[in-house]
């Protein structure tokens, strides 16, 4: 039996599609359905590694958890990871499939369409219900001919569509009506209604606006979801980095400074610290902001050499070394760890047009980028250090193209 589908689209990026999709998944899972999430194509700086070593979007991993199932590459067959200079690495069915710019990517539309439809069909054969998430807005009329992720999928799966709008940004009724007006007649028939997300205040003050809107658009507002400040869900495409910052210096607080770079990736490694009351977390993009914290974190990067050069040019690394000599600890994650060595080499220019760059020299090691990408989940135990007790069991993952020589 082929699964039925329901699709969540939005008036734009960041309106709450991923969380609403997860909530719907959870509802049907709790109601006894065998349900799974799906997103045809994702653009994300952050990714999740499945048990089989495949990369997918973190939102689909979170949604799978809401469904009570393990994340599967079928849930997100295409993942695009921006790497700078208008290029993105293409992850096809969980594995790297080269890099390209937007123009070249659209030339692959026919191939990618087959991949997406095959993945969705396989998922529908395994489950009773598939909750599909769109991307951005279905009203991107300049990109409509290459659509893989919004109304194209809704049409193929004969899926009813709910459109989500974000009232916290302002102008939600204009966003929703504008989106609806730019849809074709056939697409409008698929829309079952709208949801207003992130509402603050008195719902009675919103009621007249909803009534007027429903007089202009022949589709109902199905519900209003309140703004929830403490909802902790991994971000995918961007990060409201300054909202995570807290006042440093309080007694008993661990002051942590994260060095911000233009090509930062998998910043979800750090985001849990923002919700720990014992941590004061700040993001640093200027030397004046770095004042001898307890811990400095160099995060991952989609272009390690060019981010390293950027930090040198901004004299941020010089300040990092000064803080280190004054007692600050340094923690490097992925590309940030590679920066702590002697050299980083990219002889095949897999990430950068620059083939070699000197690191900070804090570790006697050298990094060389290779063609084969390693993605896997791991288990480990910590060794005793100033940061960790010995023997703490941890789960984690590896995503890298590099070999480190020690």
Give the ranges of each region predicted by the language model.
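Glycine-rich nucleophile elbow surrounding the catalytic serine of serine-hydrolase chemistry
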Residues: 338-340
């Amino acid at each position: 039996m082929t699964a039925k589908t329901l699709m969540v689209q939005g008036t734009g990026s960041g309106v709450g599609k991923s969380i609403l999709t997860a909530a719907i998944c959870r509802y049907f899972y709790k109601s006894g359905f065998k349900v799974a999430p799906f997103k045809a194509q994702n653009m994300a700086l952050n990714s999740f590694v499945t048990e089989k070593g495949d990369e997918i979007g973190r939102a689909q991993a979170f949604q799978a958890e809401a469904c009570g199932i393990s994340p599967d590459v079928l849930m997100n067959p295409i993942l695009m990871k921006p790497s700078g200079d208008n290029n993105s690495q293409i992850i096809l069915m969980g594995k790297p499939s080269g890099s390209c710019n937007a123009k070249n990517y659209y030339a692959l539309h026919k191939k990618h369409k087959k991949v997406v439809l095959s993945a969705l069909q396989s998922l529908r054969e395994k489950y009773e219900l598939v909750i599909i998430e769109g991307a951005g807005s279905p009203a991107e009329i300049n990109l409509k001919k290459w659509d893989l992720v919004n109304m194209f999928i809704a049409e193929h799966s004969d899926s009813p569509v709910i459109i989500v709008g974000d009232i916290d940004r302002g102008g939600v009724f204009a966003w929703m009506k504008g989106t609806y007006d730019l849809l074709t007649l056939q697409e409008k028939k698929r829309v079952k209604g709208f949801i207003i997300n992130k509402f603050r205040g008195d719902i009675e003050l919103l009621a007249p606006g909803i009534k007027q809107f429903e007089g202009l658009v022949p589709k109902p507002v199905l519900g209003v979801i309140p703004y929830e400040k403490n909802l902790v869900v991994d971000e995918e495409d961007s990060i409201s980095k300054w909202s995570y910052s807290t006042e440093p210096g309080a007694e008993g607080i661990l002051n942590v400074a994260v060095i911000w770079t233009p090509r930062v990736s998998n910043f979800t490694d750090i985001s849990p610290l923002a919700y720990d009351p014992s941590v004061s977390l700040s993001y640093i993009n200027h030397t004046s902001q770095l004042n001898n914290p307890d811990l400095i974190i160099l995060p991952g990067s989609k272009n390690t050499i060019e981010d390293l050069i950027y930090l040198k040019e901004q004299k941020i690394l010089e300040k990092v070394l000064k803080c280190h000599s004054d007692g600050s600890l340094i923690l490097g994650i992925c590309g940030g760890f590679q920066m702590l060595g002697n050299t980083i080499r990219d002889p095949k220019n897999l990430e950068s047009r620059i083939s070699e760059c000197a690191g900070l020299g804090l570790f006697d090691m050298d990094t060389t980028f290779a063609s084969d990408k390693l993605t896997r989940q791991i288990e480990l135990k910590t060794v005793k250090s100033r940061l960790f007790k010995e023997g703490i069991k941890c789960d984690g993952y590896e995503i890298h193209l590099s070999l480190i020589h020690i």
